[in-house]
Amino acid sequence: MSERAPVVTIDGPSGAGKGTISQLLAKHLGWQLLDSGAIYRVLALAAIHHDVELENEESITLLAAHLDVKFLTGNEKDPVQVILEGEDVTTAIRTQECSNAASKVAAFPRVREALLRRQRAFRTAPGLIADGRDMGTVVFPTASAKLYLTASAEERAQRRYNQLQDKGFDVNIERLLAEIIERDDRDMNRPVAPLVPAEDALVIDTSDKGIDEVLELALNYINQKLSNTN
């Protein structure tokens, strides 16, 4: 790991556009990309595969410490290929069931601690875009630039609905909205590493903004912050 490699953190709730913007920023800057949410999704999927109870913090923590996961360069559709125990789970971790399970295991303090070092190891030259929920507050508190993307629950539910429909999943938008509201409450009120903007983060509401507009705002801010540190 290189402590001197610059880091840009992108935090925010599910469906706010973190993944899309993070991928575009990493491609534009030629930097590494950390999708921290994928790590928790992989852990949740591993727990499901091994019949580990999601409410059992001790068992989940043990699983996290020995998690056999690799992140490989993917394709245009899936820029990052996720391999769990030798199996490609890139699509499997994107189900709503896996998303809800990930939020549950992420609430355990010992699980978060077990995965902290693994996440920080992604910090390598020339730089890192870190996408998650506590990247700027806990994992990389001294990041070069911090962004927090948000959007209304209704807008995020619609985006998630469209995304899952495109992948061939049969989903109900009312149920999606209820699950998003429930997850927001769980993520924002957990005792360890709650979902909140870092004090020095630029907050961008993406509800009524297109991808290009958000990307331009993010790049302008990042370039400004990086120029101030050089």
UniProtKB/Swiss-Prot annotation:
It catalyses: CMP + ATP = CDP + ADP; dCMP + ATP = dCDP + ADP. Belongs to the cytidylate kinase family. Type 1 subfamily. Its EC number is 2.7.4.25. Keywords: ATP-binding, Cytoplasm, Kinase, Nucleotide-binding, Transferase. GO terms for biological process: nucleobase-containing small molecule interconversion; pyrimidine nucleotide metabolic process. Pfam families: Cytidylate_kin (PF02224). ATP binds at G12, P13, S14, G15, A16, G17, K18, G19, T20. PANTHER family: CYTIDYLATE KINASE, CYTIDYLATE KINASE/PANTOATE-BETA-ALANINE LIGASE. SUPFAM superfamilies: P-loop containing nucleoside triphosphate hydrolases. The lineage of its organism: Bacteria, Pseudomonadati, Pseudomonadota, Gammaproteobacteria, Alteromonadales. GO terms for cellular component: cytosol. This is Cytidylate kinase. GO terms for molecular function: ATP binding; CMP kinase activity; dCMP kinase activity. HAMAP family: Cytidyl_kinase_type1 (MF_00238). Its main location: cytoplasm. It is found in: Cytoplasm. It is an enzyme of class 2 (transferase).
